[in-house]
Every structure is written in C-alpha cells, then in structure tokens.
Amino acid sequence: MIKRIAISLKKEYWHQIIDGLKPVEYRKYAPTDDPEEPFLAIVHVSGTYAWQGVILFYGAEKDPETGGYCWIIRQVFTFPEGRRPMAYYHKKNGQPITGWPQTFVELSR
C-alpha cells in the first residue's frame, strides 16, 4: 500500500500548487527516504475546517541550495466545494490530526 500523510498548507501556497505554479520541497513531510517511492498527501489549508484535496508525489530532485529533496507533484486531486470531508482536530490545541480519513484510503491502493 502506498504511504500516506496529512499536511497543512497556507491558502496562497495551495492555490499556487493547484495552478501548477509551485514546486514543493517536502523533505520534512515525506514518509519515505527513497525519492523513487510515491506517496499521497491529503491537504488541509490553514484557516479552513476541511480537507482540500490530495497530492500524489513521485520522484524527487536534489535541491542544490538546501541539500534536501524537492518532491515532484505528479497529480493533484481537489475536492468540490461543499463535498469536502471535514478535518478532525485535537481538542487541546486545535491543530489538525495527521490521520487519514477512511474515505480516501482507496486512493492509495
């Protein structure tokens, strides 16, 4: 089964990604150290209470400036307005839980 993570992004950054304008450097979020292993990231946008979409990452390029990897976006799935699954929040600090909604488990098969 493909590895999955949940990430939180700023609204402007998410829109740059879905418009194809932004490469993504996610060494700290990647659930693997192998740049050839694909993974899915479900995206929560700061200031909202819903998941916005899913990004499929596959492959990585070495970033000469940071020495880390710049993970390559292969496909972006966005959830239609009004049909987004709600995010789950920790009661203590209001941060999104890095879980994975069961509805989207089939995307990883």
Regions found by a protein language model. Name each.
Residues 1-109:
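Structured alpha/beta reader/binder surfaces that contact nucleic acids or chromatin modification marks
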